Amino acid sequence: MSSSQTQHDEIDLKHNRPKAGEIRRFATGESVFLSPLPVPTGQPPIDLGGSFLEVNDVYLDVGSSNQGKSYQARLCVMMPMFMIIVCLIVAPVLAGFGTFFNPFGRTFWYYFSDFFVFGLWCSLWTGGAAALIGIYAVVSTTRAKARTRPIRFNRQRREVCYFPDGSDKPVIQPWEDTVAWVSVSTGFTGVGVMSTYTFGMAIDDPVGDKVHFLRQGVPTPLHGLAKWEAIRTYMEKGPDFCPGQATHEGSHTFDKEREDMREEYQHKERSILGVGWWYLSHVVTWWRFPYWVAAWDQRYSMKSMPDSIADWSKPLPPEQWATQSPALKQQSADLEKAFAQGQDFMTYFKANLSEAKAEESQNA
């Protein structure tokens, strides 16, 4: 999730604190709030993008895993390799076919060697440039992730801990005061109206007089509800009822993908051409190398939490566990009753993020 400290008009936490079910409109869209008072959403809990980094009886860490890093590394290897293959093999071979159309009796190898020398220099420049772009993409994204620590949700204390970028000083606030929302923004693309959906959280820092905003793009509002429901389910019910810890990528990922490919071939779900393409594509992208890059990303970016919250993260005796507020219990019971009667979160609060703002944008 991306973070920001900018105060936005649609989420005025200082002068007009929102509550669950409230809808606020802004210039290009609207937001429906899921908390304060984190009530049930009625959606199945889903961990979008593998963000549950640690799940245990005391706390949940939500951040960015290295899922997708091996694919990014493969793309970054494929770009220079594509340039090299085109310049050193494809172009000289095509030039060599010119022997069939020339009246001077020049051989295939005459044209091939002539273009090969040119392709060698071309591949050095284009392949080198593509390699530099790929290295920058891989390293910069890993370094950016390493600067951001995960958000820690302590279910026994019913508190949330957030570390601003570059700081070892925690910002801790009560769980029931955490602001969460799903928003839609609409705009014109020249041929129609396009909507983008965002799941967000806000952590209030009264000591620093700041509000830290955290955002993640989601495919639909229901995905945002499901992401929040996964966090809420952990805090209210425990680790046995929410998604488990996200898996990380490494050499074992390559082994599993190869084993899956072989099983697909054995069960007639993949052709011999598909098997050949799998091996060819992985040879071109340097076999296990992208998965070693993913393992490096995991080691470099997944730093341990500072000692400043070591005591805060220790388990408490059950008699010291914080409990739900009466207001949350009542509102949760009301929502559960509405769900049993066939309503969902959006209809209960009369929120429709996908239609209202689209009509307003078209009228504008």
Question: What are these model-predicted stretches?
Answer:
Residues 150, 168-172, 208-213:
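Short, mixed charged/polar active-site loops
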Residues 2-54:
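Short, non-transmembrane cytosolic segments of multipass membrane proteins
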Residues 159-160, 168-188:
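Phosphoinositide-dependent membrane-docking surfaces
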Residues 179-252:
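A membrane-cytosol interface segment of integral membrane proteins
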Residues 53-71, 197-199:
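Short, hydrophobic/proline-enriched secondary-structure or compact coil segments at domain edges
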Residues 65-147, 264-364:
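Alpha-helical transmembrane spans
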Residues 55-62, 242-270:
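Juxtamembrane amphipathic/hinge helix adjacent to a transmembrane helix
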